[in-house]
């Protein structure tokens, strides 16, 4: 049976050779070459899939599909595969994933129905309205009973709240700027616990699954599908666009590929901020 390591070794020379056929700027090809040498199988599988799209489109003279495949490679290379620096809260999210899962904020639909003014008191409603009062209220809903408690959690309550604040702040930015991500403006980052059709709460096993799915979705959203890029990587992309300004076809390809980019700025130790990438202007 072929091991993952052996498969990576077999794919490596094939993928390295493929770089010679990609009409992309050298820094992009250099990044891809470094990633291929790491022999990261999930990366290779994803890259091979997009590469096949490109090769088939080229053989069939499907220019539009060929360009679309190249855009995918550029976007993945510069937004995901080479975006190794996570914001600090995402590093903590990764390192303390299970602990944060066990304390993830939630709200029962039954509680919302019993509120006199859900528009101002419900976490779900505050999320839907991108209301910053959400940050004052969710802290009372971070202890749940659907997971076995760990004797020694590594984070204090204050540390967990700090991480949640930064996670939800990034999500609120995406919800307010839906043109740069796949996030729906009505997305709610907390766990919503619905009612059964007969009006009672769903069973504990289903509630636990809701937590698992929600936290997995949030992690993949912020780390894979819509990650923020660092200030240093923003400069790399700006240099590429400057270098390719005399090649209109390639320059436009890069601009289309990176049109949804946003940047995190963590130079202020007190507060992280987000903005559109400068090269979008």
UniProtKB/Swiss-Prot annotation:
Keywords on record: Mitochondrion
GO CC annotations, alphabetized: mitochondrion
TM regions (residue ranges): none
Compartments it resides in: Mitochondrion
Keyword Mitochondrion: yes
Keyword Mitochondrion: yes
GO biological process annotation, one example: mitochondrial genome maintenance
Principal location class: mitochondrion
A Pfam family reported for this protein in Swiss-Prot or TrEMBL: GEP5
InterPro entries registered for this protein in UniProt: Gep5
Domain of life: Eukaryota
Homology family: Belongs to the GEP5 family.
Role played: Essential for respiratory growth and required for maintenance of mtDNA. Required for cell survival in the absence of prohibitins.
Name of this chain's protein: Genetic interactor of prohibitin 5, mitochondrial
Species in which this protein is naturally found: Vanderwaltozyma polyspora (strain ATCC 22028 / DSM 70294 / BCRC 21397 / CBS 2163 / NBRC 10782 / NRRL Y-8283 / UCD 57-17) (Kluyveromyces polysporus)
Gene from which this protein is expressed: GEP5
